[in-house]
Amino acid sequence: MAEIGFRRNMGLFMAVMIGIGATMGPGIFALPGELAHMIGPLGILVYLAMGFLTVFTALNYSELSAAIPLAGGGYSFTHRTLNRPTAFFTGWFFWIGNTLACSMYALIFALTIRAYFLPEASIPLLTLLTTVVFTAVNFMGMKEAIIVITVMNLVELAVLIGVAALGFTDIEPANLEPLAPMGWGPFVPAMALIYISYVGFELISNAAEEIIQPGKNIPRAILITLGISTAIYVFVVGVMMLSLIHISEPTRLQV
């Protein structure tokens, strides 16, 4: 029986859209306020440091995806290079991790919808509806899912850049003083807090068998995704810290 494979019909742009859609989730809307409360203006450096450290993971995924351009990402890497038990557990860990991440994203999305549009809505119901809608979109097919992802990515980027650009005119350098009102102790815990904001680009490798010229486009897509995400995070958080707040003692920013 002949094996049924995937069609390579996804270019660099579509691969980047997958990466940005998975990486720039609701975390950028929910975490900066917690970060400001936790560490103050030093949060700008936290995002920069996390972006720098993530480069090493991104380079690993780039190299492995180019060498093993198979669907499955991390599972395929371990299956080809190690052994079946390791690949089995790797696949399950990815599945569990992504399921938990998607659950968190759906919850944050529901909280945002209720906060700004439907104050009387039920959070469990909104979370369930969000999960059902996006699951249905994925079942429609890759082409339809990419269209939805692209539209949502462009809207999200426009909102983030637009809001940050408006706040850019109100920047006050004095808000950087003191830079670390809570000290440097929370720096590493703060990096752990925002870690999930840098997770997602690895999903590009999961679609390796559908990407045209995977050896060239996958590494490019991964690094472009990480670069865009880091730049947007630093810009948005930097403007927020410099224009909206002045932290001289622990205070919580409401997002």
Model region roles, listed by residue range:
Residues 1-33, 37-42, 48, 54-55, ...:
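Membrane-interface "cap" regions at the ends of multi-pass membrane proteins
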Residues 2-6, 44, 48, 117-125, ...:
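Helix-loop-helix junctions that connect adjacent transmembrane segments
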Residues 9-19, 45, 83-96, 130, ...:
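Select transmembrane alpha-helical segments in multipass membrane proteins
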Residues 11, 25, 64, 83, ...:
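Hydrophobic/aromatic residues within transmembrane alpha-helices of membrane transport systems
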Residues 14, 42, 86, 144, ...:
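Residue-level recognition of membrane-helix boundary sites in multi-pass small-molecule transporters
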Residues 18, 29, 54, 58-61, ...:
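Alpha-helical transmembrane segments and their lipid-water interface positions
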Residues 34-38, 46, 55-131, 136-139, ...:
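Hydrophobic transmembrane alpha-helices that form the core helical bundles
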Residues 247-255:
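A short, hydrophobic C-terminal helix/tail in secreted or cell-surface proteins
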